[in-house]
């Protein structure tokens, strides 16, 4: 379950930002996760609650926004949006899409208290 290590990394990032930006508590976190990131959202919610115990993020609301994948078709060279690895190009039908975006995860926004 790599979601636990992801949740722990999020807490570490929050603690680093708390020192830099001088806040004491996180009340809300919005993550943006690519649909191809391989992260199980329900597991991440559970693991985040566990990792946040006794931290500045304990009790924080965690929201996750999906980010669609983007790619470029190697056949027709058009940029396409996709939700899976092996979907055909909507323009030419070929299965030759190079994924350029959609595997990442980022903290999109935070709500904090001083």
UniProtKB/Swiss-Prot annotation:
GO biological process, one term: protein modification process
Keyword Metal-binding applies: yes
Keywords assigned by UniProt, alphabetized: Metal-binding, Nickel, Zinc
Pfam families given in the database record: HypA
HAMAP family in the record: HypA_HybF (MF_00213)
Annotated function: Involved in the maturation of [NiFe] hydrogenases. Required for nickel insertion into the metal center of the hydrogenase.
Cited PANTHER family: HYDROGENASE MATURATION FACTOR HYPA (PTHR34535:SF3)
Name of protein: Hydrogenase maturation factor HypA
Organism field: Psychromonas ingrahamii (strain DSM 17664 / CCUG 51855 / 37)
